Amino acid sequence: DEDQVSLATAAAGISDVLRYTLTCSDADYSTMVPQAMAALTEKGYRVEKFRNAWGGKFYQGVNVHLMSPAGVRVELQFHTPQSFAVKQASHAVYEIRRNPASSAEEVEEATRLSIAYNAAVVVPEGARAIHWPVAA
C-alpha cells in the first residue's frame, strides 16, 4: 500500500525514543550544561538540535537532540530539581493541550495552568545565556 511507511523511515522521524534527563542544582546548572555538552561531543555525539527554553511559557530547561556515534537518536533534557518537578507535574495539562479531541475550554484551562506552573520556576543564574556551540 502506498500509504505505508518503512520502519526505517518512521524511526528516523522519532527523536525521543531514548530520552534522558540530567538534573543539576541551580548553583551548578550554568556550568554543568556546557560541560556535559562538551563531553558528549568529544565522545562523538552530534548535536542535531539545541533548544534553550529558559524563560519560556510552557517549558523550563534545555532540550537537546543528539545522534550517537552508533547512529541512535537520543533526546537529553537538562533540568533543575524544580524545573523537572514542574515538567512532571504539568505533563497532564501538556497532553490536554496537544490532544485534538480536547475542547477549546479544556485547552484554554490547560494552557492557563501550564503557564502558571512554568512561571513559578526559578531560572538559575546564567541559564538563559547557555547556547551551543559555545562562542569562542
Residue ranges and their predicted role:
Residues 1-2:
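Active-site-proximal segment of RNA-dependent polymerases
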